[in-house]
């Protein structure tokens, strides 16, 4: 019984931690678009790494791309 209580408390703590740690998308609700990528290098240029995408997203003006681990690096040249 003690093991089940401990597991339950751990699960509740994880849910609370996750809801507090994840940011709310208030900027997206206001019509402002936030960049959701990390810096990467592609042919000597600094770009934005997009995880789990096969191609660069439209509407950002990317004209150079390099395949990266499980994603793509997109560059505005």
UniProtKB/Swiss-Prot annotation:
It is found in: Secreted; Nematocyst. Residues 22-34 form a propeptide. InterPro entries: BDS_K_chnl_tox, Myo_ane_neurotoxin_sf. The non-oxidized toxin is remarkably non-selective with activity on many different ion channels. Weakly and reversibly inhibits rat and human homomeric ASIC1 (isoform ASIC1a) (IC(50)=4.8 uM, and IC(50)=14.6 uM), and ASIC3 (IC(50)=15.9 uM). Molecular modeling interaction with ASIC1a suggests that this peptide hinders the collapse of acidic pockets and stabilizes nonconducting channels state. It activates several potassium channels including Kv1.1/KCNA1, Kv1.2/KCNA2, and drosophila Shaker IR. Toxin occurs in two forms in the mucus, Hmg 1b-2 which is not oxidized and Hmg 1b-2 MetOx which is oxidized at Met-52. This is Pi/alpha-stichotoxin-Hmg5b. Its main location: secreted. It comes from Heteractis magnifica (Magnificent sea anemone). Gene3D superfamilies: Anthopleurin-A.
